[in-house]
Amino acid sequence: GGFYWMTNRAGSIKIDAKILYGHSFAIYSLSEYTLATGDIRGIEYAEKIFDLIQKYCADTHFGGYFEMFERNWKLKGHGAAGGDRKTLDVHMHLMEAFTTLYECSGKEVHRRKLVEIIALIIDKILHPEFRTGIPQFFADWKIAPQIKFDIIWGWDRFSEDGSKGQAEDNTSYGHNVEFAWLLMYALDLLNLPLKKYINIIQKQYDHALAHGIDWEYGGVFVEGSHAGGV
């Protein structure tokens, strides 16, 4: 079950791995398809993917989700293979996917998993002082130096040899603002009070405005230190 990571335009499989990042967008897009068209096949497939994720990806010991798997859902190896890492990027987009899934299905299990992942991101993934996103963790949620995975979708964040400057102190300005927006959307859908989270959201926006904007040439820097700077 699930989706291959990559095919060519003719449909031939190029990379047969099962990557949680891709499955989060499958849930999101299929749920949105049903919301837009009324065609129930979208939500039916989205729920099947959700069930696969809970079966194969959920870490029932430390919480959160593993992210990188072989075709048969065997967890990939350590290091660049990504099997021992958990990331803000994937968990943020799972939150986004669970939001739209719950919006479409209205099922309690989808609401519960959405509430759980919001709490996990805030408690484990955001910096305790600056409330900015920490990119990578080991399975037990100890902060991990940011490395380049074998399968990746953000090539601009690393040098050609895969190294990362300030690998233990960097945060993505774009991800922080994106998370804040997605969180507000999820809270509205869940009918939960924004007041409880407004300080976190405000810190993330203020941090991005103060340190992430290139006021000289325009645009947004990719990332910088949690304390500020590029």
Per-range role (PLM):
Residues 1-230:
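Glycan-recognition and catalytic cores of secretory/periplasmic carbohydrate-active enzymes
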